[in-house]
UniProtKB/Swiss-Prot annotation:
Pfam families linked to this entry: KOW, ribosomal_L24
Source organism: Streptococcus gordonii (strain Challis / ATCC 35105 / BCRC 15272 / CH1 / DL1 / V288)
Name of the protein this chain belongs to: Large ribosomal subunit protein uL24
Superkingdom of this protein's organism: Bacteria
Entry annotated with the keyword DNA-binding: no
Keyword rRNA-binding: yes
Amino acid sequence: MFVKKGDKVRVIAGKDKGVEALVVTALPKVNKVVVEGVNIVKKHQKPNNEHPQGAIVEKEAPIHVSNVQVLDKNGVAGRVGYKFVDGKKVRYNKKSGEVLD
């Protein structure tokens, strides 16, 4: 998967289109990512030690990786490619040519 935890991404589809934020978690088995402050859902929490009455908690839900684009250091969004630099495989932005790793 081309997106890693800690990458800065731009959401390109969905209700949060245009938002730029960091990836909190990458879920490669299901091709999804959790992005900070994006796709907020309300979860009904049963009573427990933390919430004795129960609660409605807002949390970030995963979005499909095809709905985000990785940003480089200059803020240019583009597709991600792979190439070898000094015998090491690195990710790069295909639009700007800048190495991401």
